[in-house]
Amino acid sequence: MTLWVVKIGTSLLRGETATTIDGYARCFAGAMDRGDQVVLVTSGAVGLGCQKLALTNRPDTVVALQAAAAIGQGALMGLYERAMARHGRSVAQVLLTRSDLADRRRYQNASGTLRQLLSWGVLPVINENDALSPAELRFGDNDTLSALVAAAVEAQQLILLTDVDRLYSSDPRVDANAEPISDIRHPRELDSLEQGAGDGGRWGTGGMTTKLAAARIATASGITVQLADGRDPARLEALLQGQRGGTVFHPHPEPLGNRRSWLAHVLRPEGELQLDAGACAALQHRGASLLLVGVTAVRGDFAANQPIQLLDPDGEDLGRGLCSMDSDQLRAAMNDPSPGESSPVVVHRDGLVLRSR
């Protein structure tokens, strides 16, 4: 049994949306009939709302986008519900915000709810709660959301469907020398690609940049990611039957566990700690906890047990951790002229996750 998370982008849900969704539904039902489980993360609520309002351009204000999403979400779910019903399957709408996943208990509740739906043979249809989410609580794109959902349910496979056939070394629409890429085997290979990735289209929010970020999140959690052309549902059917297609992002050989994945990718840092070289070496090579003596600078205001970003001496991202002190306590301890015999723990190794190198 394979647990699949499939993300369908806005660019695939234009025009004859009902016909397109019918094709995807056949693929999902076929996989479920074979004993697999499928979670769908779908875009399209804003685009469908704009179609219903006969808008020629995507709204450019948050309020208008949220209103369009409110109109389109019900219609979108209706299309999926009717399409899956033709195959004797039910769907369940799950709308999420970042705050739903940032709280550890709610994160576990969301994971448990999705697992229960899957055990009943239901297709969970997930979207961001666009109609209500303020900017600071938004994922911003469904590529990221799909990777976080895949990690939460401990999926084996994440499929990112888009309107290009695979990843390229540069944008093939403007660069005739762009080279197709079939495999990405290490996070380092993503670095240069992320720098050259483009923005989203007129209707969507996720360009190739967000897909690469999603692949980084999922592969760090031990999930295989496939980026493929979803314009023909037959290609999705082939992927769900185990065939390769598009670009395959291979999982990290030492994946994060569920809690560390949550810490690394769901929580937003409330501040920064810059470390000296000795502390960096202790964290990276000896699996140590971060001690106060290794902290050279504190930035931001945060409470105890909130997530903070760790930076090396050059200001490069080292990882994230849950800080045992609030920012005022930490600054006071650093400035204490008579520290105790032992340096206190600032971030325990159990609440620490380092960036993949």
From Swiss-Prot:
Q: What SUPFAM superfamilies is this protein classified in?
A: Carbamate kinase-like, PUA domain-like
Provide the PUA domain boundaries.
270-353
EC supergroup of this enzyme: transferase
State the source organism's domain of life: Bacteria
Q: Where is it mostly found?
A: cytoplasm
Q: What is its EC number?
A: 2.7.2.11
Alphabetical list of InterPro entries matching this protein: AceGlu_kinase-like_sf, Asp/Glu/Uridylate_kinase, G5K_ProB, Glu/AcGlu_kinase, Glu_5kinase, Glu_5kinase/COase_Synthase, Glutamate_5-kinase_CS, PUA
Enumerate the residues binding substrate.
S43, D130, N142
Which family does the record assign? Belongs to the glutamate 5-kinase family.
What is the protein name stated in its UniProt record? Glutamate 5-kinase
**Gene this protein is translated from:** proB
